[in-house]
Amino acid sequence: MDAPINPSSPTRSSYETALERQWLIKDEPSHHVDLGCHFTLEIKAFSPKMIELLETGSLTLGSVYQGLYNLIKDKDCKGLELDRDTTHGNKLHVLAAAFLCVLRKYENQVRFYNVKTKDSLTGEIQYMSRVHIGDDNLGLFDPDTYRMIGGSFPEGIYRLNLRTQLTPRGEDDGLEIIMGTILTVPVRGPADRQPLGVLMDRQLRQFPVGTNPWSSLGEAKPKGRSLSLLRGILM
């Protein structure tokens, strides 16, 4: 599939403006199929100051999205892998849809699963946060929701993976980011194929095997204000 996802409104000239504004047409009947999502975001901090950002919740899902959005809109983004039906033309729609899936999954609670570890060889302390939707039949959301990002998704499997470093404004040190996204249109669950978590583990080897790997990785802390910040960015 070479053609990019087309914006719903002919008045918009770019995918960027589709993501920066709210385009929700309530009167027009929906004809889209449901979208399934497998999504994993891993954030690692190594310096004391960056560890504190994650521990205190100063770093929100919305701020991470804003950093990723600004990064991958560059055609030559380092560490970005596009495969299957994801193209440079539709990659920002895929990113936005994946984050909307996270919001729908957790509804009013966006959670980071946090754990602090110590390297057995170097003794280095690192702090890791993960956001995860582990099975695409849990990542459903209604078609009208993803119309807010200004596009409709043709049938296919959209994969977007990114390994990079984000540095907050005014800071010298950064955060290591690994994101893996698979969107399926229409939804494809375990009934007709293997869970998408199996495919994700093959692509991102350091994630634990299985579709719910975070149960033993530490306390889940609600990040309610992430929701409003992320919505402000998307809309």
Curated annotation (Swiss-Prot):
Annotated function: Plays a major role in assembly and budding of virion. Completely covers the ribonucleoprotein coil and keep it in condensed bullet-shaped form. Inhibits viral transcription and stimulates replication.
GO cellular component entries: host cell endomembrane system; membrane; viral envelope; virion membrane
Keywords: Apoptosis, Host membrane, Membrane, Viral envelope protein, Viral matrix protein, Virion
Family, similarity comment: Belongs to the nucleorhabdovirus type-2 matrix protein family.
Location(s) in or outside the cell: Virion membrane; Host endomembrane system
GO MF assignments: structural constituent of virion
UniProt-recorded name of the protein: Matrix protein
Something else known: Most abundant protein in the virion.
Organism, as annotated: Maize mosaic virus (isolate Maize/United States/Reed/2005)
Topology in membrane: Peripheral membrane protein
Subunit: Homomultimer. Interacts with nucleoprotein and with the cytoplasmic domain of glycoprotein.
Pfam families in alphabetical order: VMR2 (PF17055)
